[in-house]
A protein has these predicted regions:
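Nucleotide/phosphate-binding sheet-loop regions of phosphoryl- and nucleotidyl-transfer enzymes
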Residues: 1-182
């Protein structure tokens, strides 16, 4: 958890992780979270396997996060959404990958819509998650997802993403999910 580190731990936590830990330790209001260490990353990059011990640590950190946030990862009624952000010891703006809204799926997006009272917001988050996951994890060309977005914008006569309806964003999410599954 962020409260377990501080700014001096950049080599272990990366710059982002160390700064989040420091902000937590001085009491700034930041979202709850945890950092997977650079050591764990190196181990994974060397073996391409997440060890049982690391899985157990991640599960424990997620359990603690669920308790703090009073939400559950994968719960269709009260979903916990997390962001996965890569980091480095030195700042490299725009060079590191991010996946937002991890935890959304066809069931949890409906729960998010109910919780927020905003179906459009929920489906915008979902389509963005699918796009980021496809791009960052599966290396699907970004242009394929943009094509779905542009098609629906044209169908709805929308000049920008913000003008799309909830139904339009549902169609973008469905088309994007189909691209990922293919």
């Amino acid at each position: 958890a962020f409260h377990e580190g501080n700014a001096s731990m950049k080599p272990l936590l990366g710059g982002k992780g160390a700064h989040l830990a420091e902000m937590t330790s001085i009491g700034l209001p930041i979202p709850s979270g945890f950092t997977i260490t650079t050591e764990a990353c190196r181990e994974y990059l060397a073996s391409h396997v997440l060890s049982d011990a690391l899985w157990a640590e991640i599960r424990s950190a997620m359990d603690q996060l669920e308790q703090r946030e009073q939400k559950r990862f994968g719960d269709p009624d009260n979903p916990l959404l997390v962001s996965v952000r890569s980091g480095a010891v030195t700042s490299m703006p725009g060079m590191m990958d991010t996946i937002l809204n991890l935890g959304l799926n066809d069931r949890t997006v409906e729960g998010l819509a109910r919780l927020t009272g905003n179906e459009r917001f929920a489906y915008d988050c979902y389509r963005r998650f699918i796009q980021m996951f496809g791009d960052v994890v599966l290396h699907i060309p970004h242009a394929l997802f943009e094509k779905h977005l542009e098609t629906v914008k044209r169908e709805e006569g929308a000049a920008s993403d913000r003008e799309l309806s909830a139904a339009g964003l549902k169609r973008v999410a469905a088309a994007s999910l189909k691209t990922v599954k293919e």
